Amino acid sequence: MTKLIIHLVSDSSVQTAKYAANSALAQFTSIKPKLYHWPMIRNLELLNEVLSKIESKHGIVLYTIADQELRKTLTKFCYELKIPCISIIGKIIKEMSVFSDIEIEKEQNFNYKFDKTYFDTLNAIDYAIRHDDGQMLNELPEADIILIGPSRTSKTPTSVFLAYNGLKAANIPYVYNCPFPDFIEKDIDQLVVGLVINPNRLIEIREARLNLLQINENKSYTDFNIIQKECLEVRKICEQRNWPVIDVSTRSIEETAALIMRIYYNRKNKYNK
């Protein structure tokens, strides 16, 4: 494995640089990365501390810094060390300015923008928490997305991830031999997505959960036949109603959420034509 040092430098949380780095690293199977996070770098004193670390640990520098003087100092320093220094959004900002014929604003304001997007995200997170695991079904019409699936198919973390992207997601568990909420018999506008998983994989996850909780008596929870029937029934429910189904057996939460968002926005764009 080839070791690669990456410095993530930001005047905010470094999440943008981190996502960009991880997306790029996903293209390489033979690289073992070491990421150094340098958030909230907003003055020269803090930047100089980072520069000394970069000097002692040479590697690629990815940055998102708004202040022009700080950017110049960082890029000049890296140029002299002959190491790559890449602005994650610099090219995007420049192209936006050129295309819109609007100059980039010189004044920097580090106060977070409490705009509509921010409050929509807070509301979506609150909604996901209150409508987890089949709670408050009477408020399902407020959801953007409804997830259904057997227990431990990542419905809750996927709902929260969707919420961080501003989408209100409710989730409802399917339990073998238990009546499913009657909302499935109604015509609903929300996107409903079924989550299923390989039964053997789900057994592993559920057994780990029971061991963590020190529970040894719930045999039906890890019974292969019951788990298989739960997944088959979820598929059947979704197929009868033309609802999409996603197999999460080998998918990360981020990947599952991304697929759901693609379906959601494709559907939304279709209706908005």
Curated annotation (Swiss-Prot):
Lineage, uppermost ranks: Bacteria, Pseudomonadati, Pseudomonadota, Alphaproteobacteria, Rickettsiales
Transmembrane segments: none
Function noted in UniProt: Bifunctional serine/threonine kinase and phosphorylase involved in the regulation of the pyruvate, phosphate dikinase (PPDK) by catalyzing its phosphorylation/dephosphorylation.
GO molecular function: ADP binding; ATP binding; phosphotransferase activity, phosphate group as acceptor; protein serine/threonine kinase activity
Record organism: Rickettsia canadensis (strain McKiel)
Record protein name field: Putative pyruvate, phosphate dikinase regulatory protein
Binding, ADP: G149, P150, S151, R152, T153, S154, K155, T156
Keywords, alphabetical: Kinase, Nucleotide-binding, Serine/threonine-protein kinase, Transferase
EC number assigned by the record: 2.7.11.32, 2.7.4.27
Family designation: Belongs to the pyruvate, phosphate/water dikinase regulatory protein family. PDRP subfamily.
Family annotation (HAMAP family): PDRP (MF_00921)
Enzyme class name: transferase
Catalytic activity as recorded in UniProt: N(tele)-phospho-L-histidyl/L-threonyl-[pyruvate, phosphate dikinase] + ADP = N(tele)-phospho-L-histidyl/O-phospho-L-threonyl-[pyruvate, phosphate dikinase] + AMP + H(+); N(tele)-phospho-L-histidyl/O-phospho-L-threonyl-[pyruvate, phosphate dikinase] + phosphate + H(+) = N(tele)-phospho-L-histidyl/L-threonyl-[pyruvate, phosphate dikinase] + diphosphate
Keyword Nucleotide-binding recorded: yes
